[in-house]
């Protein structure tokens, strides 16, 4: 087809785009090195961010009493995690109440795709090999990036460790094992090797097993308290990553192979009226494999190139047996997804204060399933972004325009959703009013849309090929303050406050038909979100004692204005609390360190109807850890003890999906 030829030409012959000037632009290599340095450098980086961003990196991630990326994201403001029941349950993220489908998830710079249902289960990504987790509202503030990076309302970037060697050392080895409550065992291995000054590699692997069995209590319908044990929450998981890193004159490259294999049970809802009646024996098997590579080079002072490529294969087997759970129908389905992705981003630096960029992406997705009358859809997506950036020292401006072309095809004639062509803009600005005061005022506007997923369009009996895209419009105004002090007990202080207003239109939802066993997908809904995010971070020093503090707060009023005739018109949308916050306190003294963390989620409703029957009480948890590091010649040994949910808070993130109470864990790491 002609569009294929146009794509190839645009990917490899389009002249470069712009990013920020070379002084302000950071390669992934420099990012890694900076994030490993002291907090003074980290603070200086923070004040240059034009878009609202929250970062957890290095030792902060290491000290958190959490296993997965989803659990770590709970400490960011403006984030709601939907957790369907503890260990084995699905974990998805909702940022600023716009929905999980509007969150882009990137792994080492390339997006993790799921064309089938549009969401990524962040519970399957552990922190074992993670160096940095960043959350951006809107988009990253650098314009030298793939077009994909412009296509989401918000984005999560996970960056894994990059090998760093001291002196002439050629190998780093980190052997770890964790064990604790719920029969949890989690061994891991990280081996980093330096071939020469230009090429290095890393192998990271881990295995985890947990029974997922934990006690929980709640009040029954008759008012009596009862205790039950969470069933069918076991997980067996294996992750294996192999990465290579290389340097070339004026640039670098990296390549990675990733394999994830798991079997898990889905514990299902706990029915209050008859606890323990339904056994919930649903099982899921997953295999996720991808290989990806990236090349970045500064060919000329005025031109740089960033090229990415990826192939991914995902297999999912879901089994539900009504003989074990009478609330379900028999399901024994197998799904297979394939994805091919290629990207070329060009950066032109016209003047030190003016740069431009042009990025072209192509993505192909295919979905196969053993469903009756399945149409076997494929999707071709072309994204082209044009962006420009102006840096007048105290005033910085950015603007971008994203073009999206989506073409679906199916084996069944006339069953496809046709072709979509959309343009979506964004504008970002930041201004420093006073030269000597490290205070910045920032603002952004962004309009973006999401295509209906392949399930939304083509799932047998449920899909609707006539669905329209779902649009979001974002407005944000905020301030940032960042400063460091020398020879002072307060070493650094970072503050950011953002107020925002979002709209979601043509929201895609499931609605029942005349047959109660068949639902269909429709466009319905207008949601308005008004909110405030605030974060303050401090680094303190009292002699040999070092202390870091992080406070986050979120206020959100997310109203449903879908149906003016509804009694619940203008009510708070389900599962969005008005207030939420978190606290992280880290302390260290010589070879000892401790960490305390607190999470609070305020009152909310569990359904559209804002009535007492749907009211959910606030919940909060306290976690604490203590670690000691031993040095024996060239070997370091770190022992960590953790306690989660210290006061055994009984709570539910999602109605009828109880979370674990108090739990314990011991970690041992040997670093050679």
PLM regions and their residue ranges:
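Membrane-embedded beta-barrel scaffold of Gram-negative outer-membrane proteins
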Residues: 302-320, 434, 441-444, 470-530, ...
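A beta-strand signature from Gram-negative outer-membrane beta-barrel systems
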Residues: 127-174
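Flexible loop and strand-edge segments within Gram-negative outer membrane beta-barrel domains
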Residues: 22-24, 212-216, 227-239, 245-305, ...
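Gram-negative outer-membrane beta-barrel transporters
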Residues: 356-357, 394, 492-503, 522-605, ...
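N-terminal periplasmic "start-of-domain" segments of outer-membrane beta-barrel proteins
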Residues: 33-64
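Extracytoplasmic beta-strand/coil segments of soluble accessory domains associated
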Residues: 70, 74-111
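C-terminal beta-signal and adjacent terminal beta-strands/loops
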Residues: 506, 600-607, 615-616, 623-672
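Structural signature of Gram-negative outer-membrane beta-barrels, strongest in the C-terminal barrel
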Residues: 351-361, 365-502
């Amino acid at each position: 087809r002609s569009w294929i030829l146009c794509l190839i030409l645009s990917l490899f012959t389009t002249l470069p785009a712009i990013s920020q000037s070379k002084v302000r632009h950071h390669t992934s290599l420099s990012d890694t090195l900076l994030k490993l340095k002291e907090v003074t450098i980290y603070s200086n980086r923070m004040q240059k961010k034009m878009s609202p961003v929250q970062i957890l990196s290095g030792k902060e991630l290491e000290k958190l009493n959490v296993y997965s990326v989803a659990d770590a994201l709970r400490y960011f403001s403006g984030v709601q995690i939907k957790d369907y029941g503890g260990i084995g349950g699905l974990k998805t993220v909702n940022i600023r109440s716009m929905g999980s489908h509007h969150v882009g998830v990137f792994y080492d710079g390339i997006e993790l795709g799921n064309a089938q249902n549009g969401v990524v289960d962040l519970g399957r990504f552990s922190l074992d090999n993670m160096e940095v987790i960043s959350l951006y509202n809107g988009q990253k503030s650098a314009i030298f990036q793939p077009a994909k990076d412009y296509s989401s309302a918000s984005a999560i970037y996970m960056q894994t460790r990059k090998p760093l060697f001291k002196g002439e050392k050629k190998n780093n080895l980190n052997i770890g094992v964790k064990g604790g409550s719920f029969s949890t065992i989690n061994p891991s291995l990280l081996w980093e090797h330096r071939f020469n000054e230009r090429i290095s590699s890393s192998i990271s692997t881990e295995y985890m097993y947990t029974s997922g069995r934990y006690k929980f209590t709640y009040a029954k319908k008759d008012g009596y308290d009862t205790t039950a044990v969470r069933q069918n929450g076991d997980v067996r998981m294996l992750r294996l990553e192999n990465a290579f890193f290389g340097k070339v004159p004026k640039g670098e490259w990296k390549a990675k192979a990733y394999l994830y294999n798991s079997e898990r049970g889905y514990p299902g809802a706990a029915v209050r009226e008859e606890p323990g009646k339904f056994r919930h024996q649903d099982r899921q098997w997953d295999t996720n494999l991808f290989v990806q590579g990236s090349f970045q080079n500064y060919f000329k002072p005025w031109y740089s190139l960033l090229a990415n490529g990826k192939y991914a294969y995902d297999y999912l087997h879901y089994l539900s047996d009504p003989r074990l759970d009478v609330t379900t129908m028999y399901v024994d389905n197998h799904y297979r997804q394939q994805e091919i992705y290629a990207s070329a981003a060009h950066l032109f630096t016209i003047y030190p204060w003016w740069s431009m960029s042009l990025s072209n992406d192509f993505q192909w997705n295919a979905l196969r399933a053993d469903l009756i009358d399945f149409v076997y859809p494929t999707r071709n997506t072309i994204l082209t972004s044009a962006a420009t950036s102006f840096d007048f020292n105290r005033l910085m401006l950015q603007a971008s325009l994203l073009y999206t072309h989506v073409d679906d095809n199916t084996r069944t004639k006339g069953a496809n959703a046709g072709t979509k062509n959309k343009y979506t803009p964004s504008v970002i600005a930041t201004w420093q009013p006073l030269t000597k005061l490290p205070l910045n005022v920032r603002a952004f506007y962004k309009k973006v849309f999401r295509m209906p997923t392949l399930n939304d369009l083509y799932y047998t009996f449920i899909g609707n090929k006539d669905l329209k895209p779902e649009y979001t419009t974002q407005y944000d105004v905020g301030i940032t303050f960042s400063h460091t002090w020398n020879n002072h007990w307060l070493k650094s202080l970072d503050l950011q406050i953002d107020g925002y207003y979002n709209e979601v239109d043509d929201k895609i939802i499931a609605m029942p038909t005349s047959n109660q066993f068949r639902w269909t997908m429709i466009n319905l809904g207008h949601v308005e979100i008004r909110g405030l995010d605030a974060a303050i971070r401090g680094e303190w020093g009292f002699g040999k004692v070092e202390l870091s503090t992080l406070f986050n707060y979120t206020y959100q009023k997310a109203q449903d204005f879908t149906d003016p005739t509804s009694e619940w018109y203008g009510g708070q949308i389900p599962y969005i609390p008005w207030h939420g916050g978190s606290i992280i306190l880290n302390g260290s003294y010589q070879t000892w360190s401790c960490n305390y963390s607190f999470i609070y989620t305020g009152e909310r409703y569990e359904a559209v109807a804002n009535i007492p029957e749907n009211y959910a009480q606030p919940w909060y948890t306290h976690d604490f850890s203590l670690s000691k590091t031993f040095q024996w010649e060239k070997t370091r040994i770190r022992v960590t003890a953790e306690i989660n949910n210290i006061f055994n808070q009984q709570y539910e993130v999602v109605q009828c999906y109880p979370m674990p109470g108090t739990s314990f864990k011991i970690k041992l790491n040997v670093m050679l």
